[in-house]
Amino acid sequence: MEENISAAKTTYSADGNEVLFFSIDDTIYGIEIKYVNEIIQIEQITIVPKIPDHIKGVINIRGKVVPVISVRKRFGIEEIPYDDRTCIIVLEFDDGNQVGIIVDRVQEVINVNPSDISNTPDSKNVNANRYIKSLINLESGIRLLIDCYKLINDDGGAA
């Protein structure tokens, strides 16, 4: 099953503050939609020897080899078995590089008001915190906005 959100990209507001929210355990994180190319169901990942532990391997997307990162491993959270809601969010950067990130579930896309975004507290001692770009204060609670570049590139990442 494949969910391509490219059609939704044409309806974004001019301010570009669309955020895709996903969950790992009970915590909801966000990624700026401008980096999201597509969302696919978890599929067979080819393991590559001698790569960092958080990189699960590679997948083939329409003939392109795409590295896949476990967000759980990256954040130092215990891995769990994949289920029917486990997804790979395929990110694409300005240079054309693509990287997939494995998440427990995709939640929703929301247009976030810039006034609801604030800097993170300076608590970089927790592994996952260094990947948090900012906090988003929504009616449903505070959400954590991920810094995609740090998530992918920190300590010899995949991109």
Provide a role label for each language-model segment.
Residues 1-159:
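An acidic, low-aromatic, low-complexity terminal/linker signal
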